[in-house]
Amino acid sequence: MSAPLTLALSKGRIFEETLPLLAAAGVQVAEDPETSRKLILPTTDPNLRVIIVRASDVPTYVEYGAADFGVAGKDVLVEHGGSGLYQPIDLNIARCRMSVAVPAGFDYANAVRQGARLRVATKYVETAREHFAAKGVHVDLIKLYGSMELAPLVGLADAIVDLVSSGGTLKANNLVEVEEIMSISSRLVVNQAALKLKRTALKPFLDAFERASQNGN
């Protein structure tokens, strides 16, 4: 019997919003990663298992063949690189946007016009660097791993670059969006070798995911 396919997912919103896609393929994950300590989860299909990894690590697991396919946000693929991966489907899940936000009352447009050098906190350093360089904005980028909204409140940064869904967290911390960098959704990513060597096993999942994503799950 051949080894099962391995699907790489991250905990949280991507995992939850991938479940209906798996259901469309007739598959359920046997355990909840929020309550289970296991990082390799069986499914109701003996030919598929799910591994739970950090969101930023999904492309790496897939690129090097530790997973045959996975689900990764556009933010992760742009920041960490997805050029070595086949990206056949925009799954239209985990939708949000990457934006620049500043404290309410801070005149961002005027600061940019005057050529001010801004300190910007973000975990998306490469994406932010490219964005500001393209606009000719002078910035010092500060790498953080979480709680971006805190940085302007304590004087660490003038602005942040982060993902925004409803904007509720920004509003609660007296921050406002001033610029959208890109729209974000999650993509299916597939290992290039697996696509050739395991195409027969992969195809039912790819087809089911594509149908479900087009039909709004």
Curated annotation (Swiss-Prot):
Q: What is its EC number?
A: 2.4.2.17
Its annotated pathway reads: Amino-acid biosynthesis; L-histidine biosynthesis; L-histidine from 5-phospho-alpha-D-ribose 1-diphosphate: step 1/9
Catalysis performed (reactions): 1-(5-phospho-beta-D-ribosyl)-ATP + diphosphate = 5-phospho-alpha-D-ribose 1-diphosphate + ATP
Q: Which InterPro entries match?
A: ATP_PRibTrfase_cat, ATP_PRibTrfase_CS, ATP_PRibTrfase_HisG, ATP_PRibTrfase_HisG_short
| A single cellular component GO annotation | cytoplasm
Q: Tell me the compartments it is located in.
A: Cytoplasm
Gene Ontology MF term list: ATP binding; ATP phosphoribosyltransferase activity
Key words, A-Z = Amino-acid biosynthesis, ATP-binding, Cytoplasm, Glycosyltransferase, Histidine biosynthesis, Nucleotide-binding, Transferase
Q: What class of enzyme is it?
A: transferase
Indicate where this protein is primarily found.
cytoplasm
Indicate whether Glycosyltransferase appears among the record's keywords: yes
- Could you mention a single GO BP entry for this protein? L-histidine biosynthetic process
Kindly list the cysteine pairs connected by disulfide bridges. Answer: none
For domains, the record's comment is: Lacks the C-terminal regulatory region which is replaced by HisZ.
Q: Which HAMAP family match?
A: HisG_Short
Quaternary structure note: Heteromultimer composed of HisG and HisZ subunits.
**What function is annotated for this protein?**
Catalyzes the condensation of ATP and 5-phosphoribose 1-diphosphate to form N'-(5'-phosphoribosyl)-ATP (PR-ATP). Has a crucial role in the pathway because the rate of histidine biosynthesis seems to be controlled primarily by regulation of HisG enzymatic activity.
Similarity-based family? Belongs to the ATP phosphoribosyltransferase family. Short subfamily.
What is the protein's name according to its record?
A: ATP phosphoribosyltransferase
Encoding gene (name): hisG
